[in-house]
UniProtKB/Swiss-Prot annotation:
Record text on cofactor binding: Binds 1 pyruvoyl group covalently per subunit.
Taxonomic lineage from the root: Bacteria, Bacillati, Bacillota, Clostridia, Eubacteriales
Keyword hit for Lyase: yes
Keyword Ligase annotated: no
Organism per entry: Clostridium perfringens (strain SM101 / Type A)
Family to which the UniProt record says this protein belongs: Belongs to the phosphatidylserine decarboxylase family. PSD-B subfamily. Prokaryotic type II sub-subfamily.
Annotated positions of the Pyruvic acid (Ser) modification: 256
UniProt GO MF annotations: phosphatidylserine decarboxylase activity
Official protein name in the record: Phosphatidylserine decarboxylase proenzyme
Record's function text: Catalyzes the formation of phosphatidylethanolamine (PtdEtn) from phosphatidylserine (PtdSer).
Post-translational modification: Is synthesized initially as an inactive proenzyme. Formation of the active enzyme involves a self-maturation process in which the active site pyruvoyl group is generated from an internal serine residue via an autocatalytic post-translational modification. Two non-identical subunits are generated from the proenzyme in this reaction, and the pyruvate is formed at the N-terminus of the alpha chain, which is derived from the carboxyl end of the proenzyme.
């Protein structure tokens, strides 16, 4: 059972996990772990399932998925019957009113929907993956020089599950460098997997870029793929100015993660998020929601 902190009710909700039995089997049973290492974590598995989700045959999965996870389609730009396939639904866009944004210069917003963890004063060689597990930022982006600039800074981990809105956005106005791709495996990013695979973020497929923001300095954006996420699509134009809240890109089917690194003393994350992280809980947030300030 995964408990998530709800900022509105100040209580904990139990996360509905898509494919929970499969995840438990793959990461907690001897046979499942063997199958995971031999096949599930490999590109071929995610590619095959991704091809299915791109096909018209997958369209019939949409309504059942919406009903099972109680997804509010009134926030979506399309009706159910307008989606061409499951990936079209999965990467759905929302109405502008669905995710209000505070455009105040001193306010930091969430880059997407998901479950947020915040770690302050980070050690580059011991960045927290989940309580009890760490990884190296230098290894994550394969660029020690860039990584060193974020020593003592703040790390935000936004975990998306398959039921979430899967587009990610810019947290401020500014310009972003071209995204650098790093090949890797396709482990799940569910906490069950994070508790069973050391340095998971450094093993999975990922992309990173430097966003030069107007109000929070240089921000390191990292997008991490996961099981069945065969594609991370960047929709922004490198070095072209963007506005706060504009789309940066999106993930195709599967759970996935966005990680942001801020330099030391450039932001202050809201205290409830920091406190819940220390207690071992993620906080549910939506794109555009205020999560910190200068």
């Amino acid at each position: 059972m995964i408990k998530i902190y709800n900022r509105k009710t100040k209580a904990y909700d139990v996360e509905q996990v898509a494919g929970l039995k499969y995840i438990n089997w793959s990461y907690a049973s001897p046979i499942g772990k063997s199958f995971l290492e031999l096949f599930i974590k490999k590109k071929m598995f995610s590619k095959l399932y991704g091809n299915f989700c791109d096909s018209p045959l997958s369209k019939k999965k949409i309504k059942a998925f919406i009903d099972e996870f109680n997804i509010d389609m009134s926030l979506c730009n399309k009706n159910i019957d307008e989606f061409e396939n499951f990936n079209d639904f999965f990467a759905r866009t929302l109405t502008p009113e669905a995710r209000p944004i505070d455009y105040s210069e001193n306010i930091l917003i969430s880059p997407g929907d998901g479950r947020l963890s915040a770690f302050e004063n980070i050690d580059l060689d011991k960045v927290v993956q989940i309580k009890g597990y760490t990884y190296s930022l230098k290894e994550l982006i394969d660029d020690p020089k860039v990584a060193e600039e974020f020593e003592g800074g703040t790390c935000l981990i936004l975990r998306l599950c398959p039921t979430d809105y899967h587009r990610f956005h810019f947290v401020d106005s500014g310009t972003c460098s071209e995204s650098k791709k790093i090949s890797g495996f396709y482990y799940s990013v569910n906490p069950i997997a994070l508790n069973n695979v050391s340095e998971l973020f450094c093993k999975n497929k990922r992309e990173w870029s430097i966003f030069t923001s107007d109000n929070f300095g240089e921000i390191l954006h990292v997008e991490v793929g996961a099981t069945c996420v065969g594609t991370i699509l960047q929709t922004y134009s490198p070095e072209k100015r963007v506005k706060k809240g504009e789309e940066k890109g999106y993930f195709k089917f599967g759970g996935s993660t966005t990680i942001l690194f801020f330099k030391k003393d450039t932001i202050k994350i809201d205290s409830d998020i920091v406190e819940q992280t220390k207690l071992g809980f993620e906080t549910k947030v939506n794109m555009g929601e205020t999560i910190g300030h200068k």
